Structures are given as C-alpha cells and as structure tokens.
Design a protein with these regions (language model features):
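Short, gly/Ser/Thr-rich active-site loops of penicillin-recognizing serine hydrolases
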Residues: 393-415
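Bacterial lipoprotein signal-peptidase II cleavage site
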Residues: 23-33
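Short active-site loop at a secondary-structure junction
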Residues: 90-94, 110-168, 213-226, 294-297
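Sec-dependent bacterial lipoprotein signal peptides
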Residues: 1-21
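Extracellular mucin-like PTS domains
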Residues: 34-68
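A short, well-structured edge-of-sheet supersecondary motif
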Residues: 84-116, 374-377, 383-385
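Short, surface-exposed loop or secondary-structure junction motifs
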Residues: 161-366
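Beta-lactamase-like hydrolase cores
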Residues: 66-102, 201, 205
Length: 415
C-alpha cells in the first residue's frame, strides 16, 4: 500500500483514540511493571555574603568571612511508594516526575521502571503551552500582534478575516475543533506528515467545505484541532523562520534543552488504540522527517526539558540570563481568557493560552492524550511534570494521587 494511503487509512484509529481520551476511559492493565530504578536530584541555592572589618594600627585586619545559608531541604520520600504501587497495578513500563520551584530550581527529579533522565516521550496535547509560547514570543518581539487578524500577516488569512492568533491559541477561533469528529475531512492534513505546515494552514483557512460548521470567534470553546496548525503557520510567516528553527531559537538554545522537537506521529506509529505507541520507544528516528509537524500534539521531550520550561514560566520568563517570554505574555497565557472574553467554562475549568485553568484551586495544567500531566501552582511558586506512557485517564489518575503530596513537600521546605 502506498505510504500516503496507509497514513490516511490510519485516521479512523486516530479518531477512536482521541474520542476515548476525551471520555476518560480506564487504561487496560498489561503485564508486570519492570524493575524499579530511581534517580533523585535536589538543587538548592547558596547565599553568600562577605563582611570585612576595618584594619587598625593595634590589631590586624580580620579575615574575610563567608556565610553560607543552609541549603533548602525538601522531603519527597512519600512519592516513590505511591508511584511504584501505581505502575505495578496498571502494568506500566515506568514513569517520570520532575518538580521545580521558583527560587530553588529543580528540587526533585525521579524515574521508575524503564524511565530515566534521557528517555524521550511523546507528549501529545502537552505541546500546546509550548506552541502558545512561540506566538507570544513573537508578540513580545513586535513581529506579530496576537490581537490583530491573521490576515494582517498571511495572505491566505483573508479566508477568515475576523480570526486572530489569540483566538487560535485559546481554542476560540470558531473553526472546527477535535470533537465530535477528530478526523474531520476538510482539516485532515493536520494529522499527515506529508506536505507543509503552510500548505495545511492555507487549506484549513480557505476551504469552503467547513462553511456550515464554523462560527464567529469568541463565541464557543472548541478544543484543539487544526486551529493550532494555523497558529504555527502564522508564526512561520511572521518570523520568516521554520517551526523547527523557532523551537530551537526560542526554547532549545536559551534553556539548554536536550530533545524538544515536533513531528507528526499520529498516523506513523503502530500500536494499540487509545494508548501510547510503544513502538516509538524513546527514539525520534522512528518518525519520518516532516515539514508539517502536528502542533497541538506532536512534541516530544525528556522530563528535564519540560521541567526547564516550567521553571521558565515560574521565573518570569527567564532561562538563566536569557529572556524567553515577557511577564505580560506569561500573565496572558496563564489567565482564564475564555471566561474573560466570552464567559465560557468547560466543566469548571477555564482556558488561557495553552493552559487549562482550574477555576476552583487556580492550578493550571496542560495534560496530554498519552498520560503526560504538567502543572503549575503560580501562587506557591512551584510546578511539576509527570509522564507515563499510557493514556490520559491513567496519567490523570496518578497525578490525582500526587497533587497534594507534591504540594505538602514544597510547603514543608526547610532551610
């Protein structure tokens, strides 16, 4: 069968997979969990001060003294038994967790089973906050006005003259989202690793075949879908750079990331529907090179990579001495835009730009189809990234067991 035909034939499986994730079905249990190995890293700052006395004719100068503040100490020992029991009960191949704190950096980094610091995992929708950040960076640089029509940037934007980039990255464009039909015909290019991002976005934005299904922007929350392809294409036009180059320039180089990149994996990898494609096995070379990465769900990372991005969000947009995002852009990403713009909510959750906003506890998250759960507690100044290679219900179930444990460990910091 020709490769293109095989890719298209995979779309019904993709549709079933995405619907299952939305419904929160339980993951099936497999065999026994592999042997557990853990790596734990604690990082805390040192404060150095110098005091020098005055030299007199009757006494020698006192030596310079250095006072080192006690290192911050966190107790995360409650986490491992919970995770070990969970992966054994679900038959998982392991898990990874990194916790970062605004002042202390990486305060916990642990892996179980087959996972380790170098393991690269597909993260599905946990890609969205990464994408939103690229557009906000271009906004910071004056290359893109996220509140102006797409048509101001891209010639093909005239197809939907009222839609802005801010609409796209808040799932508020009025274009057809993932549901109820993830394999929506007019937008099928978003899941194919053939063609280009520009070509796909132009097709999505100009096709007349969706006319009966689209609505005005900022009138209804429609999660996911090809609006994210359009967002990436707008970023390419505004910057004059490819998506891969933008990822490298904005995130990889300043933040020292090891693996972050995008592809379009959904129709390339064989595996059981509804679950992580085990055939990827931490190896991006299993994917064909593509000029049409899937932006809403096509990234892959290590735990350390995602932790660095979370820390950047906590440290006012800085990676080391390099500014990645402005404070103003971060505030917009983290705020509940859909409630502010048109009074929408989704079962008690709001949505910013790439982030779900829990309207009850203020926690923001960007969970993925395959079991990744990143979260930030902006008020208390910490964040965490949890990864299992399973499905969304499984990742969310484990995260639910860890939210309070992580919070208590951070709150109990000493030193």
């Amino acid at each position: 069968m020709p490769r293109t035909a095989r890719l298209v034939a995979s779309l019904p499986i993709l549709a079933a997979l995405l619907v299952q994730a939305a419904c929160g079905g339980d993951a099936s249990s497999g065999g026994q969990a592999s042997g557990t190995t853990t790596t734990t890293v604690g990082v805390a700052p040192e404060t150095t001060t110098s005091t020098t006395s005055t030299t007199t004719t009757t006494a020698p100068a006192e030596p310079t003294t250095t006072t080192v503040a006690p290192a911050a100490v966190y107790d995360f020992t409650a986490i491992s038994p919970i995770v070990q029991a969970f992966i054994a009960s679900k038959g998982l191949n392991g898990a990874g967790l990194i916790v970062v704190q605004r002042d202390d950096g990486v305060v916990h980094h642990e892996h179980w089973g087959e996972f380790g610091p170098e393991r690269i995992s597909l993260i599905a929708s946990s890609s969205k906050m990464v994408v939103a950040g690229i557009l906000m960076r271009l906004h910071d640089d004056g290359l893109l006005d996220v509140d102006a029509p797409v048509a101001d940037v891209a010639a093909w934007g005239a197809g939907n003259p009222e839609i802005t980039p801010a609409h796209l990255i808040s799932n508020s464009s009025g274009l057809v989202g993932l549901f109820p039909n993830p394999a929506y015909g007019p937008y099928v290019c978003q899941f194919l690793p053939i063609g280009t991002l520009q070509g796909c976005a132009e097709k999505v934005f100009t096709t007349p075949d969706d006319d009966a299904d689209i609505i005005p922007p900022d009138t209804e929350f429609r999660y996911g879908g090809a609006q994210w392809q359009v967002a990436g294409a707008v970023a390419e036009v505004a910057s004059g750079k490819s998506w891969a180059d933008l990822i490298d320039e904005v995130y990889v180089q300043p933040c020292g990331l090891e693996a972050l990149a995008f592809n379009n994996p959904f129709t390339q990898l064989e595996g059981e529907p509804y679950r992580y494609p085990a055939s990827f096995n931490s190896d991006p070379s299993t994917l064909m090179a593509t000029d049409n990465p899937n932006l809403e769900g096509g990234a892959y990372v290590t735990t350390g990579d995602y932790g660095a991005l979370l820390l950047m969000h906590l440290q006012e947009g800085m990676c080391g001495d390099t500014r990645v995002l402005s404070v103003e852009s971060l505030e917009r990403m983290h705020s509940d835009r859909i409630m502010e713009a048109y009074g929408a909510d989704v079962g008690g959750s709001g949505y910013g730009m790439g982030w779900w906003v829990d309207q009850e506890n203020g926690r923001i998250t960007d969970g993925g189809l395959y079991g990744t759960v990143p979260w930030l507690d902006l008020e208390d100044g910490y964040g965490a990234y949890l990864v299992v290679e399973a499905d969304s219900p499984t990742g969310n179930a484990l995260a639910g067991l860890l939210y309070d444990v992580v919070e208590e460990a951070v709150a109990g910091r000493t030193g």
